[in-house]
């Protein structure tokens, strides 16, 4: 119900949260405007909606994502970088403004409207967008000619631009880096595009796409792996851990039983997990351009549940999931973060947190019934074709 109320019916776009300026740290500066739609949410939204049987809503959001892809490719002039976020109507003027005459909850400042991250380079969005398209395609709604042409243009662009620093999934304001998560998602983008092209017989430069996909894989496995930490790290020049990498087995980049992955998960257990709750990373060890600290991330905790379940630690996954449920409010809703004393922090309710909750519940239930592994339960279940929107 909450996710449907956060969806703009004319376009199917889902806002990240209906609020702005609720602080990630009481009295701190980590206050953002979330009243927009992130491309990043697409894959996780489509997966959750399909898992709950809301195929029409999944198709509508998938079509909204495709429309954004078409805007940046398929016109015969090559592709251009997508924006990472848009207004619900698809426009992208999100200039950030500080409202000096306001203060947020318990004096938290500054209060911002708009979002300066809209102009950042975040290469992971291509993986999340193509994963959403692939999930929709797997349920019968294949890309139309214009849509596929735009996707092909976009993948050709990505082949030429994936190997560069960006601001990353956490939208840091401390400079661009070679973030491992972004590289993983670039691999996802090309992998899913190859699957669609081969499965549907669509024209594509498959040799180029496969070559670059494999180059990304080799780079991540060598430069993303830190032999001293015995873990995959946040970016190539650090020993800092990052819970965004919990998606590596979720996206099929590594086996959930790969020894390198199991060592990474063990390292996260020790450094990023506190009483079953998961931090994104250590801001003091990896400066992100902002002051202060933050709470644990609800999204990351649910990713942790999923990763534990797929890696065979079903008892641990159940315990973390049950513990996390105790932090919801009286309506079962979550904000973006949870503080050290159990208070909810950040914008509320946050779509990403609830999408991750749904996905973790679906996957945990499937693993408990069928045994741990990397089978994708939504696609493993029988399901009819998705109706074409409109």
What label would you give each PLM region?
Residues 1-390:
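Acidic, mature catalytic/reactive cores of soluble proteins
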